[in-house]
């Protein structure tokens, strides 16, 4: 197999909300890439040795004195460079052109008239009826380039942006004022393919099969004949991590499945059946429900509940790891967005989002090496790897489930009675979404237990029982979300089933809050 890291694109992040999309598109094309803060050093770029460089968009203005700049070495490295939005503007400024703020800001759909067909725009045209090639694109900018650097030509214009694209074919420098990475730019993926494959000359060998082969080889090289321990939750990341490690080291992998009593209906049995029986993994099930529930008694605050659940998990996992006296490595399902969010910026100006729980090493008392076979992969890539390894699609494409599980879906204090009722109600909700074809139309759906009683009528009698709320949302990025407009007859069917089949629930409500102002989870 060819080295899948041999050809690679470096993406410098200037803070755009779309920057990770650039990386995902390049990976989709079949080429490895990494995303770094814009203020990297020349030495770091030299060591990475990119085949091409992409400068992302960003929220700053190139007209400000302290605005971010690409390292000068970017333009001296002898590799093709593509500037996107802010990336085009800083390229123009740094190479001797001019930018200025515009009275006509462009946000949303625009049509670019192609003035010259350079290598970047080869074979691209979204308007076949026009004598002049045009591209349907997505704009999001205030500043614009007003004077080209020496050696550049205008390759695209819009009515309000005379220099919407530019190129210097001799040095293979290209700039586009629009965002090719978003799906609204119709030929965006084709444009990026032109840059990455045709201009940079990258081989498209970043495929699930090659990634698996590479990961297995690297695991073997890292751990050799040593034994590895992994906390297996049944979620996508830990499941794919488990199967990669199992393929590489077989029975030297010890999986610990901590059943905390906060899982979905029959989930513990399903995990054991899938990974123990079907895939033959060496897996230990720790039934810790009583321990978790005891620790959570009297705790009502959501953050305090999260912390306690995390603490008890670490304690239980640590006890199990000490029983495996020959284990030398801990495996984690860290994925690439975790690594990006935790990357430190040299100047402190780059936009670093948060510190992530999977990144930054282990507790001091755990004297184990760290194995992270997914740390180069985006979530969609992890799912593709899982599919190639034999995991069922319905498991890989399941809606997100929070780390604390039902601990944040039972409001207030957590009790076994509440969890048992919630499990049954939620299973009915999800089953009916599947049966009606709505499960994959919504981004996330779940049930919340409300610790209040409401009067109900059953037969000839009145009784007070608990209330649950159904929640279903539609979202692209989980940063904002709309409540899903499920059909009334479907909601009615779900409500009737829950009230009739789950003894202890007398009322079902539907949450019609968007994000913002509400969050997706209730706690």
UniProtKB/Swiss-Prot annotation:
A Gene Ontology term for the protein's cellular component: cytosol
Entry EC no(s): 6.3.5.2
Pathway info: Purine metabolism; GMP biosynthesis; GMP from XMP (L-Gln route): step 1/1
GO terms assigned for molecular function: ATP binding; GMP synthase activity
Active site feature: 85 (nucleophile), 179, 181
GMPS ATP-PPase domain location: 206-398
Reaction(s) catalysed (UniProt annotation): XMP + L-glutamine + ATP + H2O = GMP + L-glutamate + AMP + diphosphate + 2 H(+)
Subunit structure: Homodimer.
Protein name as it appears in the record: GMP synthase [glutamine-hydrolyzing]
UniProt organism field: Actinobacillus succinogenes (strain ATCC 55618 / DSM 22257 / CCUG 43843 / 130Z)
């Amino acid at each position: 197999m060819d080295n899948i890291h041999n050809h690679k694109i470096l993406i410098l992040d200037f803070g755009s909300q779309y920057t990770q999309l650039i990386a995902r598109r390049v990976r989709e094309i079949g080429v490895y890439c990494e995303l770094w803060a814009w203020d990297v050093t020349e030495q770091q770029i030299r060591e990475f040795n990119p085949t091409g460089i992409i400068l992302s968009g960003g929220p700053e203005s190139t007209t400000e004195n302290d605005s971010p700049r690409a390292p000068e070495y970017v333009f001296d490295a002898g590799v093709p460079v593509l500037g996107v939005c802010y990336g085009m503007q800083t390229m123009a400024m740094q190479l001797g052109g001019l930018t200025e703020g515009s009275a006509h800001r462009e946000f949303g759909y625009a049509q670019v008239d192609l003035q010259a067909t350079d290598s970047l725009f080869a074979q691209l045209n979204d308007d076949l009826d026009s004598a002049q090639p045009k591209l349907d694109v997505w704009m999001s900018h205030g500043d614009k380039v007003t004077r080209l650097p020496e050696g550049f030509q205008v390759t695209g214009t819009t009515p309000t942006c005379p220099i919407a694209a530019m190129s210097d074919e001799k040095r293979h420098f290209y700039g586009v004022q629009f965002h090719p990475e978003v799906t609204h730019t119709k030929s965006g993926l084709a444009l990026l393919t032109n840059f990455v494959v045709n201009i940079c000359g990258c081989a498209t060998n970043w495929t699930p099969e090659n990634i698996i082969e590479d990961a297995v080889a690297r695991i073997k090289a890292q751990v050799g004949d040593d034994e590895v321990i992994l906390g297996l939750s049944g979620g996508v990341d830990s499941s794919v991590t488990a199967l990669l490690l199992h393929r590489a080291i077989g029975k030297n992998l010890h999986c610990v499945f901590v059943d905390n009593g906060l899982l979905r209906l029959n989930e513990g049995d399903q995990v054991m059946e899938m990974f123990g029986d079907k895939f033959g993994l060496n897996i230990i099930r720790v039934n810790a429900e009583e321990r978790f529930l005891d620790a959570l008694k009297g705790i009502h605050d959501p953050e305090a509940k999260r912390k306690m659940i995390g603490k008890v998990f670490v304690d239980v996992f640590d006890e199990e790891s000490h029983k495996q006296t020959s284990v030398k490595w801990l495996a984690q399902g860290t994925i690439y967005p975790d690594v990006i969010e935790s990357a430190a910026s040299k100047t402190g100006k780059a936009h670093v989002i948060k510190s992530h729980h999977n990144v930054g090493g282990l507790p001091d008392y755990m004297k184990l090496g760290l194995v992270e076979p997914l740390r180069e992969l985006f979530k969609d890539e992890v799912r593709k790897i899982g599919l190639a390894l034999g995991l069922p699609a319905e498991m890989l494409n399941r809606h997100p489930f929070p780390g604390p599980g039902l601990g944040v879906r039972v409001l207030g204090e957590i009790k076994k009675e509440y969890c048992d009722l919630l499990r049954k109600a939620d299973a009915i909700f999800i089953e009916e979404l599947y049966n009606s074809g709505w499960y994959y139309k919504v981004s996330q759906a779940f049930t919340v237990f409300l610790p209040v009683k409401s009067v109900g009528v059953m037969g000839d009698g009145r009784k007070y029982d608990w209330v649950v709320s159904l929640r279903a949302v539609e979202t692209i990025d989980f940063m904002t979300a709309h409540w899903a407009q499920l059909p009334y007859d479907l909601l009615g069917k779900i409500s009737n089933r829950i009230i009739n089949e789950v003894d202890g629930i007398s009322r079902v409500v539907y949450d019609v809050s968007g994000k913002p102002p509400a969050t997706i989870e209730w706690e």
